[in-house]
Amino acid sequence: MRKDIHPEYHKINAVCACGNEVELGSVETEMKVEICSACHPFFTGKQKLIDTAGRIEKFKQRYAKHFEKKAEA
Protein backbone atom coordinates (compact mmCIF):
# COMPACT_ATOMS: atom_id res chain seq x y z
CA MET A 1 0.00 0.00 0.00
CA ARG A 2 1.10 3.53 -0.62
CA LYS A 3 1.95 5.62 2.41
CA ASP A 4 0.20 8.84 3.46
CA ILE A 5 -2.92 8.40 1.28
CA HIS A 6 -5.19 6.55 3.70
CA PRO A 7 -7.46 8.39 6.14
CA GLU A 8 -6.73 8.20 9.85
CA TYR A 9 -8.78 5.45 11.52
CA HIS A 10 -9.56 5.90 15.22
CA LYS A 11 -12.10 4.94 17.89
CA ILE A 12 -15.12 7.19 18.37
CA ASN A 13 -18.39 7.15 20.31
CA ALA A 14 -21.54 7.01 18.19
CA VAL A 15 -24.28 8.85 20.10
CA CYS A 16 -27.94 7.95 19.59
CA ALA A 17 -30.86 10.36 20.01
CA CYS A 18 -31.97 8.27 23.03
CA GLY A 19 -28.62 8.95 24.73
CA ASN A 20 -27.04 5.54 24.20
CA GLU A 21 -23.34 5.59 23.24
CA VAL A 22 -21.54 2.87 21.29
CA GLU A 23 -17.78 2.78 20.78
CA LEU A 24 -16.67 1.91 17.26
CA GLY A 25 -13.90 2.59 14.78
CA SER A 26 -14.27 5.14 12.01
CA VAL A 27 -12.50 7.74 9.93
CA GLU A 28 -15.06 10.31 11.13
CA THR A 29 -14.47 12.38 14.26
CA GLU A 30 -18.00 12.01 15.64
CA MET A 31 -21.21 10.22 14.70
CA LYS A 32 -24.81 10.93 15.69
CA VAL A 33 -27.60 8.47 14.86
CA GLU A 34 -31.38 8.66 15.25
CA ILE A 35 -32.06 5.02 16.16
CA CYS A 36 -29.86 2.35 17.74
CA SER A 37 -30.37 -1.18 19.03
CA ALA A 38 -31.29 0.19 22.47
CA CYS A 39 -34.33 2.08 21.14
CA HIS A 40 -35.22 0.34 17.84
CA PRO A 41 -38.65 -1.41 18.02
CA PHE A 42 -37.26 -4.65 16.56
CA PHE A 43 -34.75 -5.05 19.39
CA THR A 44 -36.88 -3.64 22.24
CA GLY A 45 -40.13 -5.41 21.35
CA LYS A 46 -42.05 -2.16 21.82
CA GLN A 47 -43.92 -0.64 18.91
CA LYS A 48 -43.49 3.10 18.54
CA LEU A 49 -44.36 5.41 15.68
CA ILE A 50 -41.56 7.54 14.32
CA ASP A 51 -43.11 10.23 12.15
CA THR A 52 -40.69 12.91 11.04
CA ALA A 53 -42.28 16.17 9.95
CA GLY A 54 -45.82 14.76 9.68
CA ARG A 55 -45.18 12.55 6.65
CA ILE A 56 -48.10 10.27 7.43
CA GLU A 57 -50.55 13.18 7.66
CA LYS A 58 -49.26 14.60 4.38
CA PHE A 59 -49.76 11.23 2.69
CA LYS A 60 -53.29 10.88 4.05
CA GLN A 61 -54.23 14.38 2.90
CA ARG A 62 -52.76 13.84 -0.56
CA TYR A 63 -54.53 10.55 -1.23
CA ALA A 64 -57.74 11.01 0.78
CA LYS A 65 -59.78 11.95 -2.30
CA HIS A 66 -58.38 9.00 -4.27
CA PHE A 67 -59.40 6.51 -1.60
CA GLU A 68 -62.86 8.08 -1.17
CA LYS A 69 -63.57 7.72 -4.90
CA LYS A 70 -62.66 4.02 -4.83
CA ALA A 71 -64.87 3.42 -1.77
CA GLU A 72 -67.88 5.04 -3.47
CA ALA A 73 -67.47 3.06 -6.69
From Swiss-Prot:
Binding site for Zn(2+): 16, 18, 36, 39
Transmembrane stretches, start-end: none
Cofactor: binding comment: Binds 1 zinc ion per subunit.
Pfam families: Ribosomal_L31
GO MF, any single term: metal ion binding
A Gene Ontology cellular-component term: ribonucleoprotein complex
Domain of life: Bacteria
UniProt-listed GO biological process terms: translation
Cofactor(s) needed by this chain: Zn(2+)
Keywords carried by this UniProt record: Metal-binding, Ribonucleoprotein, Ribosomal protein, RNA-binding, rRNA-binding, Zinc
PANTHER family: 50S RIBOSOMAL PROTEIN L31, CHLOROPLASTIC, LARGE RIBOSOMAL SUBUNIT PROTEIN BL31A
Subunit structure: Part of the 50S ribosomal subunit.
Role according to the record: Binds the 23S rRNA.
Entry protein name: Large ribosomal subunit protein bL31
Taxon lineage: Bacteria, Pseudomonadati, Thermodesulfobacteriota, Desulfobulbia, Desulfobulbales
